[in-house]
Curated annotation (Swiss-Prot):
Record field: catalytic activity: hydrolysis of (1->4)-alpha-D-glucosidic linkage in 4-alpha-D-[(1->4)-alpha-D-glucanosyl]n trehalose to yield trehalose and (1->4)-alpha-D-glucan
Alphabetically ordered keywords of this record: Carbohydrate metabolism, Cytoplasm, Glycosidase, Hydrolase
NCBIfam families from the UniProt entry: trehalose_TreZ (TIGR02402)
GO MF entries: 4-alpha-D-(1->4)-alpha-D-glucanotrehalose trehalohydrolase activity
Site residues, Transition state stabilizer: 400
The protein's Enzyme Commission number: 3.2.1.141
Keyword Kinase among record annotations: no
Gene (name only): treZ
Pfam families named in the record: Alpha-amylase, DUF3459
Residues reported in the UniProt entry to bind substrate: 265-270, 329-333, 399-404
Gene Ontology CC: cytoplasm
Species this protein is from: Arthrobacter sp. (strain Q36)
Protein name as annotated: Malto-oligosyltrehalose trehalohydrolase
Subcellular localization, as worded in the UniProt entry: Cytoplasm
PANTHER family: 1,4-ALPHA-GLUCAN-BRANCHING ENZYME, MALTO-OLIGOSYLTREHALOSE TREHALOHYDROLASE
């Protein structure tokens, strides 16, 4: 199936089509633009793609125009479903924005492949004291020096309130004004490319936030009464869904074309309920490939999925979806259990080095095996001939796994340097694509907590209660869970950059820099396939080792020293001074790791 995009995403910069709107539910639509009213007419239908569209004549086309829509005589103007700017909030008028006006300086940027890369996940509001795109741009040289290749931004689309994780967005085409708005976003991507960094934008297509969502007033964007964890499901396969899918695909095209991002992280794709013969994820992959060919650089789509289904990664010509990557939560769980000892909730199946060994070899732990947390079998095996290990994006910490702890405590708030070093070595030398959570690299002491700023008190209360209910199986004590609506919860989550130069923080930061440098200089760590990973371990002595080509990674999870034979002749990296390589015997101190070569 071949599609040519974008459609409405390419609204002319000038002319009345800028204000065209899909409102099949309306009997009449009036455009309010620049303080004047313009009666809109139904678009002449040449095919089903025109059904439900309205157009206006004579509306202003120059400058920044504030505008909205009056439906069926209602005197309250609604923002544009495709609004590019909401300077006064999600309930106010939209403002026109011309993305082609920006003068890009990144013509030399050739893009970046996922294989061999390191991703750095950050939230704009808490990454810097200012919480803006401009302030984040001031840290690009630091990130380049850290050795990362992609910056992955948590969602930036417009939401109600001042601060939020970003998953309550309601205007998918608009960049949140508190971050700087759409032009600031263009400047940030331009600056990132100048620093040699790609940008991956986290996007949410499975639900909309609870405040400021006017899409149902215009058309059947949602499946009323058919929901997921976060609200009504998006209408991907019901009546009118051709236009809804078009809306989403045009949004995907906007990020890749107008903002020149290098990839998208697709939030919770298991919640995209689509019974069509061609799943929308397949359309995503086809569109991204089309745009990649147009712009002449690689573009990457990474799915967050808890299905453990490698079909996401298989080529479309063999009935796959053709995405470049997907998250592997199993890797996180196996690492987490083995450095913390926690086995509650969904960690219960990962309470052994055997689980970690299986993940390193096979990519998934649950590949058709029984999941005690789900109380059913889960996942399917990966076809090693069809998928490279780099297609699995892994981490020891991320915004979900830390933020969805009762108090949002990072590993660095409870674990010693040695345990943090073990997690770092596993993540950055394993077969997969590593992703770091902002501040992880220096062992940030600040938590990453769940925060909201809903102006409506009832929404704030419902959010706090719903969150505790969602994670009741993790054994949370409600008394210690921070109030998401308390401004202090947000402020506590901001990084303290001063500590990165102090004590074990600085020591850990240097280890991360050494690990990213080692990845770049050691092809065996990044280029080999699944079948090239060999793993051995001793459950009682608590050591594990794995080989990739001519490189071995040795890890001691115990509080006692360990000696390992057959360790090679060259020490490439050690997590502390207690590590020794004598002949081909490695001496590892407690909670330490080494990378050696033959």
């Amino acid at each position: 199936m071949t599609h040519t995009y974008p459609r409405e995403a390419a609204k002319p910069v000038l002319g009345p089509a800028r204000y065209d709107v899909w409102a099949p539910n309306a009997e009449s639509v009036t455009l309010l633009a620049g303080g004047e009213r313009y009666a809109m007419q139904r678009r002449a239908e040449t095919g089903p793609e025109d059904a439900g569209w309205w157009t206006a004549a004579g509306a202003p086309t120059d400058g920044n125009v504030d505008y909205g829509y009056l439906l069926d005589g209602d005197e309250t103007p609604l923002p544009d479903p495709r609004t590019r700017r909401q300077p006064d909030g999600v309930h106010a008028l939209s403002r026109t924005f011309d993305p082609s006006a920006y003068s890009w300086q990144d013509d030399a940027w050739q893009g970046r492949e996922l294989q061999g890369a390191v991703i750095y996940e950050l939230h704009l509001g808490t990454f810097t004291p200012e919480g803006t795109l401009e302030a984040a741009a001031g840290k690009l040289d630091y990130l380049a020096g850290l050795g990362v290749d992609f910056i992955e931004l948590l969602p930036v689309n417009a939401f109600n309130g001042t601060h939020n994780w970003g998953y309550d967005g309601v205007q998918w085409f608009a960049v949140h004004e508190a971050y700087g708005g759409p032009e600031a976003y263009q400047r940030f991507v331009d600056a990132a490319h100048a620093a040699g960094l790609g940008v991956i934008q986290d996007v949410v297509y499975n639900h909309l936030g609870p405040s400021g969502n006017y899409l149902p007033r215009f058309g059947p964007y949602l499946k009323q009464g058919e929901g997921n964890t976060w609200g009504d499901s998006v209408n991907l396969d019901g009546p009118g869904s051709d236009h809804v899918r078009r809306y989403i695909l045009d949004n995907l095209a906007m990020w890749l074309r107008d903002y020149r991002v290098d990839g998208l992280r697709l939030d919770a794709v298991h919640a995209l309920k689509d019974e069509r013969a061609v799943h929308i994820l397949e359309d995503f992959g086809a569109l991204a490939d089309q745009i990649s060919a147009e712009v002449g650089r690689p573009l990457t789509l990474i799915a967050e999925s808890d299905l453990n289904n490698p079909r996401l990664l298989y080529p479309r010509d063999v009935n796959g979806y053709g995405l470049e990557g997907q998250w592997s939560d199993d890797f996180h769980h196996a690492v987490h259990v083995n450095v913390t000892g926690e086995t509650t909730g969904y960690y219960s199946d990962f309470d052994s080095l055997a689980a970690l060994a299986k993940v390193l070899r096979d990519g998934f732990f649950h590949d058709g095996s029984y999941s005690s947390f789900r109380e059913r079998h889960h996942g399917r095996p990966i076809n090693f001939s069809a998928v490279h290990p780099a297609a699995l994006v892994v981490c020891s910490q991320n915004h979900d796994q830390i933020g969805n702890r009762a108090t949002g405590d990072r590993l660095s708030q409870t674990l010693p340097y040695g345990s943090l070093a073990l997690a770092a070595v596993l993540t950055l030398t394993g077969p997969f694509t590593p992703m770091l959570l902002m501040g992880e690299e220096y062992g940030a002491s600040t938590p990453w907590q769940f925060f909201t700023s809903h102006p409506e008190p009832e929404l704030g209360k419902a959010t706090a209660e719903g969150r505790i209910k969602e994670f009741e199986r993790m054994g949370w004590d409600p008394a210690v869970v921070p109030d998401p609506q308390d401004p202090e919860t947000f402020r506590r989550s901001k990084l303290d950059w001063a500590e990165a130069a102090e004590g074990d923080h600085a020591r850990l930061l240097e280890l991360y820099r050494s690990l990213t440098a080692l990845r770049r200089s050691t092809p065996d760590l990044t280029k080999l396939g699944f079948e090239d990973t060999q793993v051995a371990f001793d459950e009682d002595a608590r050591w594990l080792r794995f080989r990739r080509g001519g490189v071995q990674v040795l890890l001691n999870f115990s509080e006692q020293p360990v000696s390992l034979d057959g360790a090679g002749t060259a020490l490439l990296l050690a997590t502390d001074d207690a590590v020794r390589l004598e002949g081909e015997r490695a001496e590892l101190g407690p909670l330490s790791a080494a990378v050696v070569s033959d």
